[in-house]
Design a protein with these regions (language model features):
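Short, flexible loop/turn elements at secondary-structure junctions
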Residues: 13, 48, 134-136
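Conserved small/polar residues in nucleotide/adenosyl-binding loops
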Residues: 151-152
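Entry/capping segment at the start of metal-dependent catalytic domains
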Residues: 1-36
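Conserved beta-strand scaffold positions in the cores of enzyme catalytic domains, especially
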Residues: 6-8, 41-43, 127-129
Length: 153
């Protein structure tokens, strides 16, 4: 029997456009449905490609310079292979914040560029995805006194 798990993940990118800008960093952690951590977390940096320029603000936000990413980062094919391995494990629900509009697109583009099925991980082997941004908004709308204000994030 497949164990259903949640894979909480987030990207930092070299810009704001998921179709054009490349991933800079990926972090993810797997939990069971009771939110107990399962396995080891993943935190990897991507090597910038020579055909793109990172937005200068990306380094200020993440603290990772292009030089640091060149030295410590993985080539895109290896970077996305690590991510695909985590997200395509049977029974995985990929969970993110604003992931349907951003992170899923950031994942799909390097998968496509590296000749992987860009959407298979989302539905094959009992897998799914969940963008919690709407849940967070609903919680804020229902109980604004008990949630963090968007202006303080």
């Amino acid at each position: 029997m497949i164990q259903n798990t949640l894979y909480w993940h987030d990207y930092e990118t070299f810009g704001l456009d998921p179709a054009r800008d490349r991933p800079e960093q990926f972090a993810g952690i797997r939990t069971d449905e009771d939110l107990n951590i399962v396995g080891e977390p993943l935190n990897i940096i991507a090597r910038p490609t020579p055909d793109t320029l990172p937005h200068p603000m990306s380094s200020l936000i993440t603290g990772i310079t292009p030089q640091q990413a060149l030295e410590q980062g993985l080539p895109e094919a290896e970077f996305i292979a690590h991510i695909l391995m985590k997200l395509s494990q049977p029974g995985t629900c990929g969970v993110g914040y604003n992931s349907q509009r951003f992170d899923d697109e950031v994942t799909r583009n390097p998968l496509y560029r590296n000749l992987h099925d860009p959407k298979g991980r989302e539905w094959q082997h009992g897998n799914s995805r969940w963008d919690i941004i709407d849940m967070v908004r609903d919680c804020h709308d229902l109980r604004p006194e008990d949630t963090v204000s968007y202006t303080h994030l």
